[in-house]
Regions:
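The feature captures the beta-strand-to-loop junction immediately N-terminal to the Walker
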Residues: 35-37
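Helix-to-loop junction immediately C-terminal to a conserved catalytic motif
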Residues: 50
Length: 264
């Protein structure tokens, strides 16, 4: 059953229709990608899904509620939605621990529960060693882990991730991918949009590819990578997916890409 669904989204800027009747859905516990080339309209779709901008037409359904006209804060408070922006959202002058505790205090969680939950999140996200460090001193990976940990304070049922793999090193990317899988295993739904398709597509259960403001295709990673128009206009002909070993169900065949680059 879909926990999150958008139906017939439309958005124009001036005379240009940048999103034209887009539909997509996210099932409970599912990881879904929203992908597409630059200028395709995927970012506008994502921002309408989050509640950052209103659609001209269409509906956004969250937990069986029509939240089309709800601002983001209400979708989080009453609908169980979490959102991680591409830009840093940590309180830079506070320590890692204070970032988590401040969020819990805002929610009215009692002191004893706050401490226990804070310790749990610090451990789960491997940021115990920097618990007393100011957020402004964190590495990109530490900051990203803190942001996701802070999201979980609100116990979201679905998390929307905007460019989660931007500005972090390959080791941290692997770590964030595993965190996303773990969240899915816990029953939390995930919607991701990211320009880093090699990092995003392999961890999704399904993905949607947007082109020219319309939905070009959707399906499993293997299905979308084989779609002729998606390959032509977005993925490229040299990219393949292999069913791979654990913990990643799909890995990119970089050999084909490398061979093409050296012979082309």
């Amino acid at each position: 059953m879909a926990i999150f669904e958008v139906c017939g989204l439309v958005k124009s800027y001036g005379r240009r229709r940048v999103v034209d009747g887009v539909d997509f859905r996210v099932e409970r516990g599912e990881i879904v990608g929203l992908l597409g080339p630059n200028g395709a309209g995927k970012t506008t779709c994502f921002r309408m899904a989050c509640g950052l901008i209103p659609p001209e037409e269409g509906r956004v359904i969250l937990n069986d509620m029509d939240v089309t006209d709800w601002p983001m804060y209400r979708r989080a408070r009453d609908g169980g939605m979490g959102y991680l922006a591409q830009e840093s959202s940590v309180f830079r002058a506070l320590t890692v621990q204070q970032n988590l505790l401040a969020m819990m205090e805002m929610l009215g969680i009692d002191r004893k529960t706050r401490k226990a939950r804070c310790d749990e999140l610090l451990h789960d996200f491997n940021i115990e060693k920097v618990r007393k460090s100011k957020a402004q001193s964190l590495s990109g990976g530490e900051r990203r882990r803190l942001e996701i940990a802070r999201l979980l304070v609100t116990d979201p049922e679905i998390i929307l991730l905007d460019e989660p793999f931007t500005g972090i090193d390959p080791v941290t990317i692997d770590n964030i991918q595993q965190i996303i899988r773990n969240l899915s295993d816990q029953g939390i739904s995930i919607l991701i949009t990211d320009h880093q398709v090699r990092e995003t597509l392999p961890i999704t259960d399904r993905s949607y590819v947007v082109r020219d403001g319309k939905m070009l295709c959707h399906g499993t990673p293997d299905q979308v990578i084989q779609h002729p128009e998606a390959r032509q206009h977005y993925f490229g002909e040299a990219i393949e997916l292999n069913s791979g070993g654990p913990p990643q169900p799909h890995v990119w065949n970089r050999a084909a890409e490398s061979a093409s680059r050296h012979t082309g």
